[in-house]
A protein has these predicted regions:
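Residues within the helices of the helix-turn-helix
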Residues: 6, 17, 46
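Key DNA-contacting residues within the recognition helix of helix-turn-helix
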Residues: 6, 31-32, 60
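Short, Lys/Arg-enriched C-terminal cap helix and immediately downstream tail that follows
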Residues: 8, 42-43
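Short alpha-helical DNA-recognition segment
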Residues: 13-32
């Protein structure tokens, strides 16, 4: 699981739906990224990182 993504999202009180809206992805895809059913592309990681003001590569830790 992408625990850092989950932690950041919850810490910032964002739902999967709201985060998805902010980066142009559906809630279903955010869920798949978090569960690692689908690999998180670097391009999407960079958009998520901008939302949370973190380095994109930290999402993979």
């Amino acid at each position: 699981m992408l625990y850092e993504l989950i932690r950041l999202r919850k810490e910032n009180k964002l739902s999967q739906l709201k985060l998805g809206e902010m980066i142009g992805k559906k809630q279903r895809m955010i869920s798949k990224y978090e569960r690692e059913d689908v690999e998180l592309p670097v391009s999407v990681a960079k958009r998520i990182a901008k939302v949370f003001d973190v380095d994109w590569w930290k999402l993979y830790e």
